[in-house]
Amino acid sequence: MLFLEEKKIIDKENVIGSNIRRIRLEKGIGQTELIRDLQLRKIAITRETLVKIEGGRQHIKLDQLRAIRDILQVSYEDLLQ
């Protein structure tokens, strides 16, 4: 179940993080490359934060999700289901 809380998406089952990792790997994009692309879009994120998001130990922010969706060229549905 997903909740939007103060521009953070609460994903108790880590659906989003797992999907980000799966899609990123399917597209051959490394964590460092994704972080670089996010930072070029002025998204404040570190590799450590991405590792935590993918591992379900940190909630993703709405602006991070939006930018990751654009970089990976997928729909919100691909990330949320």
Enumerate the predicted regions with their spans.
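Short, conserved catalytic or interaction motifs in soluble domains
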Residues: G55
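DNA major-groove recognition helix of helix-turn-helix/homeodomain DNA-binding modules
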Residues: K61-D78
